[in-house]
UniProtKB/Swiss-Prot annotation:
Keyword Cell inner membrane recorded: no
Protein name, as recorded: Serine hydroxymethyltransferase
Recorded metabolic or biological pathway in which this protein acts: One-carbon metabolism; tetrahydrofolate interconversion; Amino-acid biosynthesis; glycine biosynthesis; glycine from L-serine: step 1/1
Catalysis: reaction(s): (6R)-5,10-methylene-5,6,7,8-tetrahydrofolate + glycine + H2O = (6S)-5,6,7,8-tetrahydrofolate + L-serine
Biological source species: Sulfurihydrogenibium sp. (strain YO3AOP1)
Length: 422
């Protein structure tokens, strides 16, 4: 499979082989990461990477697009079926570009948007001051109730009434609970605002029927195609039919040029996989695993923000152990457990330090792990966090992680191609 790469560019081959080994031997617990199927990767590595196809299916600015049209049509129809959407654009290169296309298609510079605070679990592209969404538009931010650590819908309502936003944004990057999309729509309607939902983190769970679907409530729904959806890295936009032309012209030609047809092919494959019964079982297991992990961590003395999870992820408050997020990330990394430091609501620490870590179960579940494995992992996490500088304890945890990973190989068919185990 990789013979040409190995011969032509041994340096790149070496780096990729090492990454293959890292993925096989580490527990991937970053909530935004997952593993695609081999079929998805084969589509993305296909001859479609050679084809330019500016425009939309059957309305291209280049010849020779008859086969890429088939691929994009498949991606669109599968995506619409997956979420019950009226219209879909599968060309955005990322979730950020999908969000930009929605904003610019409906708003003018200086218009007000109402989104979730980044430090309370929102996303950069929902109006953070360091992002174009918070520079071009007048960004007002809602957050969490300090007692419940749930979205403060009373605050959303109050800010919406006070600032009269043109668009309200729902969705998050570090919020583990169910979002009440109907409530957001009710508030948006009362103040005459459009509603955009960024379901990037929850898309696979929504497709699997274990998390509420925002499509009936929002004029616009954006998503990435990786994370819980297990596709290639990319973005999509779903919308009501009346906004289709606005969205299409803002994706192309205003924000992007030629679509990445090899990535769109991989998206089509992933959407097809997500329509299966097996994927529904996968989504159910992701949530079961997350709850088992959270319960075990709490039993071991850690605090989970909001007291649990309804999704694939959770925020762990490390203050009971007097540990910082950056310390935890580094120590767990030595034990082959990959996590990311993350601010918790009302965090007193800097974003480069933090008082918490974010954990996810989507990738672990793709490997085939179940609740008992989550409890085993939780014990290793706590063991490391209580012994940050104890190399012996960290080595013991790493050995157990290696044993666990070997029981759930990712891509055994490709071991030889990547030189794994040689």
């Amino acid at each position: 499979m990789l013979n040409h790469l190995k011969n032509v560019d041994p340096e790149v081959y070496s780096a990729i082989s090492k990454e293959f080994k890292r993925q096989e031997e580490h527990l991937e617990m970053i909530a935004s990461e997952n593993y695609t199927s081999q079929a998805v990767m084969e589509a993305q590595g296909s001859v479609l990477t050679n084809k330019y196809a500016e425009g939309l299916p059957h309305k291209r600015y280049y010849g020779g697009c008859e086969y890429v049209d088939i691929v994009e049509d498949l991606a669109i129809e599968r995506l619409k079926k997956l979420f019950g959407a009226e219209y879909a654009n599968v060309q955005p290169h990322s979730g950020s570009q999908a969000n930009q296309a929605v904003f610019f298609s409906q708003l003018q510079p200086g218009d007000t948007i109402l989104g979730m605070r980044l430090d309370h679990g929102g996303h950069l592209t929902h109006g953070a001051k360091v992002n174009v969404s918070g520079i071009v538009f007048n960004s007002v931010q809602y957050g969490l109730n300090p007692q419940t650590e749930l979205i403060d819908y009373d605050e959303v309502y109050r800010l919406a009434k006070e600032y009269k936003p043109k668009m309200i944004v729902a969705g998050a990057s570090a919020y583990s609970r169910v979002i009440d999309f109907a409530k957001f729509r009710e508030i948006a309607d009362e103040v005459g605002a459009l509603l955009m939902v960024d379901m990037a983190h929850y898309a696979g769970l929504i497709a699997g029927g274990v998390y509420p679907n925002p499509v009936p409530y929002a004029q616009f729904v954006t998503s990435t195609t990786h994370k819980t959806l297990r596709g290639p890295r990319g973005g999509v936009i779903l919308c009501k039919s009346e906004y289709a032309k606005d969205i299409d012209k803002w994706v192309f030609p205003r924000l992007q040029g030629g679509p990445l047809m090899h990535v769109i092919a991989a998206k089509a494959v992933a959407f097809g996989e997500a329509l299966t019964e097996d994927f529904k079982k996968y989504a159910e297991q992701v949530v079961k695993n997350a709850r088992a992990l959270a319960e075990e961590l709490m039993a071991e003395g850690l605090r989970i923000v909001s007291g649990g999870t309804d999704s694939h992820m959770m925020l762990v408050d490390l203050r009971p152990l007097n540990v910082k997020g950056n310390q935890a990330e580094e120590a767990l990394g030595k034990a082959n457990i990959t996590v990311n430091k993350n601010a918790i609501p009302f965090d007193p620490e800097k974003p480069t330090v933090t008082s918490g870590i974010r954990l996810g179960t989507a990738a672990l579940t793709t490997r085939g792990m179940k609740e008992n494995d989550m409890r085993r992992i939780a014990k290793n996490i706590v063991k490391v966090l209580k012994n940050l500088d104890n190399e012996k304890v960290i080595q013991e945890a790493r050995d157990d992680v290696l044993s666990l990973c070997s029981s759930y190989p990712l891509y055994p068919d490709w071991f030889k191609d990547y030189g794994y185990g040689e």
